[in-house]
Regions:
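Cationic, low-complexity basic patches in intrinsically disordered or flexible, solvent-exposed regions
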Residues: 12, 16, 38
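Glycine-rich beta-solenoid repeat tracts in large extracellular/virion proteins
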Residues: 146-151, 166-195, 311-318, 336-344, ...
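Short, solvent-exposed linear motifs at loop/edge-of-secondary-structure regions
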Residues: 218-233, 266, 272, 318-330, ...
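Extracellular "leader-to-stem" segments immediately downstream of a signal peptide or signal-anchor
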Residues: 3, 20-25, 31, 38-39, ...
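Predominantly extracellular beta-rich ligand-binding scaffolds that present long acidic/polar faces
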Residues: 157, 469-588
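Ligand-binding pocket scaffold of soluble enzyme catalytic domains
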Residues: 130-133, 155, 159, 269, ...
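Right-handed parallel beta-helix
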Residues: 155, 320-331, 346-357, 369-382, ...
């Protein structure tokens, strides 16, 4: 709707939004309405408001303005799902991950295009589409495309009729600033590690959780903009959290260094926040008029320091509120390009997409925050050795990679740079096709570079978890209620191009290498009967802990700090054939299952974790309830020590298949071992409409 100016006082609210009506399950929320938003001349069609009873009567809270950056909802101080299990110094508020308020369900179509439409026509439709509307591509094949571009164009959805109906076939990519990509969602200016559009010294405000900082300059910074915070790497190892990428460090912390990924050189610790207010202004889009800046979320890490030259940098014209939905992207003829590149963005998304044979990553997220990649299917890359990624995140924060199917890709879930506060959840990974070595089980979830911290992996089913030491150190990663099998359905057998047979090498469930410290491994189901041979020793162990590596004349030695800083609690593995609650003598199985050996790091001088007082665990560390897209008859949670009667064989009944795995096996008719050609996919045939989970109203 178009609001009159000025907006009439007390303009009538519309009926409750069906997509958010399920939120009224919360007992204190009465109704949720779409209310026309007419203030500040922002041109936003509506906001969503929740009403609840308070001591003073009826109160209201703005929940969601689906077009502009979502900065109106306050941050609630509330207990985290992990409270009482993980020490607060070792975890983050992961409920903030993904598009703030959820991906908007846009219904207004600004342009409808038909098969035969050219790249130029699609790009023109995007460029001219009003804020909050949809460019719709009818069913059919759109051939010969050479790069779809959102050049700073926010608030637009490019939507097809379904990934099994609308087919986009690319012959080349488009220059996405410094990269080639078949679809480019990026800021209007070039802001990157080698040439920031704007930069400043970060003068004060470094404490864990702080939301108030000061900068030396705020040129071109606006309320609602993403702000990239960083600092110098650690010059030496003090035996605690260590941020390092330089192979010349003694001893070496990295095999290859990290000078070509998203962070500024030697400034690998990064958090991207959003400006809430600055100086005296707090209206979205207004230019900052003072150097005191309020941010959201607060700082996740406790090691920010004035001694490490902390700094900030930002785009002048970042993009927000744009997304790609419900179509198929065929990259086979577009050699060497990324599939979808998202840069200098906030609150953008990829949903219901099928990607085929990308030149590099199917989706790369760079200098971006609160990006959602969900309900999609990614198949094959052109190079099955290096840069063969499903979803790649670097120099990002608070991204949500959720409920995707990833098949026949060497590195499906690649953290190739900082991703503080990111959530990787409920993805199904099969057949990590890798041609560098025969019979080799390739890792599914890589932490690959320096600066990775405060990640959450939850509910994933995949062959292997891997924290490597190729490009630097990682800290404070949480792994909750996943199944890591320690094997894959099939591995490359040396017969080009796609020959496969049974795997026989690197059959490890979790490989956590040197300088991957302060990890939390909780309630996971690990290993495969008949394959896994040892708990943390032998040829096919459940765990490899703290190991070094050598390559190109560089040796990263084993790290004796990894094991004593590691928290393991409530995990089931097929070698132990029991759940391990190994904290202290009061825990079940202490003398028998645990051998009277604690796996909870209680005695550390920093980042210590007390033994949890209970073996009870929440269903999720980022969701407050079963999500709406989860089938009503499906076990929730699907994986963990408290799960019984699961339908995945050989793991003591502690694991059920997830919706993504069910979609792959039962709807798409995928092979159990992950082999075969690309499959037909439509997210709507597998998943219910998603709704958001919002904080409780204040009491």
């Amino acid at each position: 709707m178009t609001c009159p100016s000025p907006c009439p006082l007390g303009q009538q609210a519309t009926e409750p939004d069906a997509n958010f009506f399920s939120l009224t399950r919360r007992p204190r929320i009465l109704r949720i309405f779409n209310v026309p938003k007419c203030f500040h001349g922002e041109g936003v069609p509506f906001v969503r408001m929740a009403f609840w009873k308070s001591g003073a009567g009826l109160a209201a809270l703005v929940l969601m303005a689906p077009i502009l950056p979502q900065i109106l909802a306050p941050t609630f101080a509330r207990a985290q799902q992990w409270s009482g299990i993980i020490d607060p110094s070792r975890a983050a508020d992961w409920s903030k991950a993904g598009v703030r308020g959820g991906i908007p369900s846009r219904t207004m179509v600004c342009a409808t295009l038909n098969p035969g439409a050219t790249t130029s026509q699609i790009n023109s439709a995007i460029a001219s589409c009003p804020n909050g509307q949809v460019v719709f591509l009818n069913a059919g094949t759109y051939s010969g495309l050479s790069g779809i571009m959102f050049n700073g164009k926010g608030g637009v959805t490019l939507r097809g009729a379904g990934a099994d109906k609308t087919f986009l076939v690319f012959t080349s990519g488009v220059g996405c600033h410094s990269l080639a990509s078949d679809v480019c969602i990026t800021a209007a200016d070039t802001n990157w590690r080698g040439g920031p559009s704007n930069s400043a010294n970060w003068a004060s405000g470094y404490a864990l959780g702080t939301t108030n900082i000061s900068l030396s300059s705020v040129t071109n910074l606006k309320v609602g903009s993403p702000l990239i915070l960083d600092q110098l790497d650690d010059p030496s190892d003090t035996g605690t959290v260590f941020v390092c990428q330089d192979p010349a460090t003694v001893p070496s912390c990295s095999l290859e260094g990290n000078t070509t990924n998203g962070q500024r050189p030697n400034r690998d610790q990064v958090q991207i926040v959003q400006v809430v207010s600055c100086g005296t202004v707090s209206t979205a889009g207004q230019a900052c008029n003072g150097t005191n800046v309020t941010i959201t979320p607060g700082l996740y890490m406790a090691n920010w320091s004035s001694t490490k030259s902390p700094g900030a940098w930002w785009a002048t014209l970042p993009i927000s509120g744009s997304g790609i939905e419900d179509l198929s992207l065929d990259h086979t003829a577009s050699t060497g390009s990324f599939g979808i590149e998202i840069q200098n963005a906030i609150d953008c998304w990829v949903k219901g997409v099928r990607g085929i044979d990308s030149g590099k990553a199917h989706v790369e997220l760079q200098e971006s925050a609160r990006i959602s990649v969900m309900d999609s299917y990614f198949y094959l890359t052109q190079n099955a050795v290096t840069q063969s990624y499903g979803v790649e995140s670097l120099n990002s924060s608070d991204n949500l990679i959720q409920n995707n199917i990833i098949q026949f890709i060497a590195a499906p879930l690649m953290m190739n740079g900082s991703c503080s506060g990111c959530v990787i959840a409920y993805n199904f990974v099969t057949n990590d096709f890798f041609t560098a070595s025969t019979g080799y089980v390739q890792a599914s979830t890589n932490q690959h570079t320096a600066g990775i911290d405060m990640l959450l992996y939850e509910g994933n089913i995949a062959p292997q978890f891997y924290a490597d030491n190729f490009h630097g150190t990682h800290n404070l990663v949480t792994v909750f209620r996943n199944q890591f099998i320690g094997n894959d359905g099939a591995c490359y057998n040396g017969a080009p191009p796609y020959g496969e047979s049974a795997c026989n090498n690197n059959q490890v469930a979790m490989d956590i290498r040197a300088y991957s410290r302060f990890y939390n491994l909780i309630a996971n189901v690990l290993g495969q009967g008949g394959t896994s041979t040892g708990y943390q020793s032998g040829s096919a162990p459940i765990y490899k802990i703290g190991g070094g590596n050598s390559a190109n004349g560089v040796t990263v030695p084993a790290d004796s700090v990894v094991a004593p800083t590691l928290m393991r609690w409530g995990n089931y593995d097929v070698v132990t054939a029991a759940v391990r609650w190994c904290g202290n003598s009061s825990n079940p199985g202490w003398a028998t299952t645990c051998g009277s050996t604690s796996e909870v790091p209680t005695g550390l001088s920093k980042y210590a974790n007390a033994v949890p007082a209970t073996t009870s665990l929440p269903a999720s560390f980022y969701l407050s309830a079963k999500p709406a897209w989860w089938p009503s008859g499906k076990a929730w949670p699907p994986i963990g020590p408290d799960v019984t009667g699961g339908n995945i064989a050989g793991v003591g009944g502690h694991a059920y298949t997830t919706p993504a795995q069910d979609c792959y096996l039962n709807v798409m008719s995928g092979a159990a071992n992950g082999t075969g050609s690309v499959l037909t996919f439509n997210a709507s045939r597998c998943y219910s409409s998603a709704s958001v989970t919002l904080p409780l109203p204040p009491t």
